[in-house]
């Protein structure tokens, strides 16, 4: 119970009570399998690369046939999630273990969390870290071209995208296109099938670049210098120097695996978008977005039924319910 609380919440949750542990002969094989999986992530990462290499899900001649193409690949997505969880368990297990070492039986303090964060951070060649670093390179390119940066912040998202994707953007365009080639499958809420990836809709990314650039253009050199973050490790972090290398390897594996999972999820995003458009064209959906408010099995029912099935209106009602739920605020 305490280990789960620390791993998920970062603190002890008194209401979480661990069930009685199973006998040792049951636990020991589980522990050995878990340790073996943590120590050998490479085969699982290769397997995820193989799943991603299978490529796009084809759009067939009818909505029902397209649904079947998606359904045939669904086991790949389930397997990828399972592989990701196993590979990520190495990095995930470190946090509660280190917090337990620091805090003992007491509640971990902010200082303890800072020490653990310091041990896990700083790994080189972490794929997700380049999301922020790559955006920083684009910002530096814009700042280096003062005539372009001033106009970029005032462009609409569509106009800004067109400019970044054109040769007129010069070096900034090269940086942006390289960034999208590497990270175009990512987004906020990137494992949400309804959330478009940046390659499909880079508006959130462009808005973020514009906001950051606007702030830097309006700040002084002194303000930018004052914003530099202190990266020196907190006191007490040195005691974990021996395991830092292992921690960084675990973080790299986790983030590589997550990127592969997001890439595979993006294949399904594109397939569902195409299927939504197809069902609209067949008169089975009111709009393509409403496909995200049906269960996968319900989409088959809708695609097989004549136009006008009740699930068409059910999807719209569920979307309205979500819109209402998003207005709720809890104290």
Regions found by a protein language model. Give the residues of each.
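Contiguous hydrophobic, helix-prone segments at protein termini
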Residues: 1-331
